[in-house]
């Protein structure tokens, strides 16, 4: 048996062990492998990264080499393309396809290539001759091709490094961005330039080429560049060689002590502002698209250079390289062209021997000297301009008019005649002047050219010029001199390279192809441009400015001091612009235009006129200080007057009138500021204290409408109200209440034009308003905790709104409906008054209550609607009964709250918490009210509705009548034993005496809560009792609150009953309101008899509503009868009547009328109802009948007065109501004794009567308890109409079932835990809630 097991164990155990060990080993190995991989991964990734970096570097290097080769091949491609076309032009046609710039390397290279192709020679130029040969080559080519040499040098960003042409063209090593410095620089190098930094110009046409980024001197001296050249005149070569050798001897810095006649810089000097003479044929069929593209880029950049000149950074670098820049001058007629150097004793003249400075100065007397730097150029005066127009210029291209020929500027003495042969080119080609036709250029030059001279002695310190011009147009003296001579930068303020300190703060516009220096130049150019376009400059103004400028210049040889130069700047003008900046963005132009306008206003116009006037008003003449507008020091700030605008033709002229302006001293501004601050502080302090000036208070009154008037501001003293009424007094605006300090009055007098204004402050609320607000918040909080609908607590603030009405408004009111906005805090008519008109209708007027209900329905759920109410419902605060009005307001609010509770429902928890909270204090107030009720008559109740804690005691006469009624009821009870037909009326009479004794005095106080609990068809709505009825048209129960039967017959009796009801439960009626009711009371009296033909059972039902709260606490649990029929068979009309009058206070009877009515009712009840004997035959019915009579005895007399007979249904309803109160009476007997122990002797007598009447009812109660299950089931299964009508006459058995049903019902109601009492008016609950009194 065990052998297989052991075998398996012996075999499996080792396998298990070894297998586990193997698995563990595998796991360990896997973990180690993973760890190793993780540790080695960074090393491998690092190696890969290094490899990628190295590979990327190699790729970048190869890419750079490839690109450099491509760039170097571009000129070769250009040449190859030209060669492939098979084009062999004539010598004079070579430059037709190229620009006229003699120093453009690309064009020169192309021209040389073409020249060599034509000649077939390949010559290499040595290093010493490369520079001059280049210049000579350019000059020769231009002379043979009739092209002008008055062009500037510019280089392009797309220039190649190491431009290697064919054997004819030497390598142009690193040609990009080279600048023209001096002819000796031609020996040097075209050093490295910034690849993407497009070339800038020769400073007004000097052909000295220097790279943007310069190499060291050694590199410059040792660099070799082979320059192309054409066959040159040997004479020119020999004349230029000495200067080149001189420039190369031991010069680490490139100096300019050489003659530039071969390059004719003077010619370029004066021509640069107007001369970019590009002669292009109309059609270039031999050029390929690529060549055309390159040429187009070249031309565009050259034009841009011509417009904007050399960037500031390039000029600064050149200044470092050339410490002694040359000077140029415009020669007179037939005078030699010289190149003058500052601080240099010798001047080398081309083709002439060296002469001294004095000799040169004598030769050039009266001629302007031009500086080397573009930023320091000056313009010509009118005379010199006229003189220059008469000077022939053979080297320049013949232009359509002598004006443009004069613009060609200085000219050389040699080779001039050779260029005359090229004048025929002007007939074939158009000359482009900065992209404009020649005619346009001519007109601009002839019209606007003007200039200004400069000192001509080299030792004279040359102040920076204040009125330079833009490169593509002439200019007048500058408009905005922004720097002083002492602090001027090397470049002129208005030069393209100059930027004022304020300009650095301007918004930088992102123009992709412009550098910072270019943008700065553009910005200033646009400043000039905007002025010229917007305002223009008439010829008369220009001539006057030119004359002024001419008078400011001195002849040659006389030094001009810096002061004189500074004084000469007073004549200010702007430059004339000639073309639009098509490449400039529109948004940039707009921004610049705005900036220009702002700058003009700030620099030329000063502060706005209004500000100046306001400052002057604050100061006297002695406190003003006149400051010269010409001063720019910070201590002497000047504010020039606005520039006058004069219209001359179609142009607006800016006449800069620099008149002295008065400006306040700083300490005066400080004083004014301190005065204003102190004034504001004092005002704020007074306002915080609640003291408002009369003018401010009056403005508040004006802003508040009369309908919504508010109580006077409490902080204004009564003695000052007279000032508030003097609105017509003009001085009242500036008056201040006596509590204001005197200094403030003086301050206001010092500033008569000012009116003190204060921000709106929250008005101080009265104590009553604060209390109402607090109450509103509490109600909202309770509504939130109890889960009430929003409409409930939304309506509460309206109910809390005070009836604040000024007496003036009250006197103006007319007896007509008034629309009142439903605002939460301020209302003319309080919401409580609206509740009165919508509340109980004691007259029994179904239609009137229904109409009012219809008006009220939209007002409750809809917030902010207009509610139209009759004027009768408004509360008059001027009523003499102030206490009555206050009480009435509270009761109306409570009534309104109860209406809302009935309509929308209150949760059970809210009711329980309310009962527990109010039970103890209300018990005390109720007991006090019971004592007071015994000593006061019914007349006071009719005059004014009084709250429960101040209800007066009933009249002793009424007590006597009640006792008499009790005796009569006892007699009736004895007669009932003898005859069953008379038993019920007698028992009812006896019941009246029994119940009226303990609680007859409390009828007025507890009637409202009975009315509230009368809804039969809504057993779930179990709200606490309150001093108000249900709101009309909200409950659909036809038998909710029936009307009194007495209101249906006699109008006189109706009025009497209405008076009783107003005294009992109409708490919302004030004395003033009762005086206005006669007209309204007459209407329901005539209508009720037709509306309620059958009202006996409704009368008994309404009496049941009035009864429970009037009597002992035993009645309250049976206030609500879920099993009451909604309709009675055979009484459809009465059902409709019940629907119309379900929320009215129908049963409100005075104690004085009870005995009289009881005496008249009893015989009618016994005579007119023969069928009543059947229900009363049963033994247990006797006690119950007595209970029913007790319930209905109080109200039955009134019904008997109105209607002589009782119907069958009314009697059965009385029995039903009696059965509802049997069980609580027996249980709460002890409570009844304790509650009425504090009453007067009359109350004790009533207790004895009640005890006697309750004795026969004990046995029925016990029997009803034993039959609870069957009675309850029958009560639940029976229809509601069986309780009333002919079906109730079946026999004693059915009556017994009914009795059992009613005896069972109180227990079920109490089991449900729904309270049936009003803590405010029903003393039962207050006593029951005390310790030792279980509920």
Swiss-Prot record:
Pfam families attached to this UniProt entry: DUF4599 (PF15371), FAM75 (PF14650)
UniProt source species: Homo sapiens
Principal localisation: membrane
Subcellular locations according to the entry: Membrane
Transmembrane stretches, start-end: 8-28
Coiled coil (UniProt feature): none
Entry's family note: Belongs to the SPATA31 family.
Polar residues composition bias: residue spans: 414-424, 972-1000
Gene Ontology cellular component list: membrane; nucleus
UniProt feature, compositional bias: Basic and acidic residues: 1047-1064, 1071-1083, 1129-1139
InterPro entries given in the database record: SPATA31, SPATA31F3-like
Lineage: Eukaryota, Metazoa, Chordata, Craniata, Vertebrata
Domain of life where this protein originates: Eukaryota
Protein's UniProt name: Protein SPATA31F1
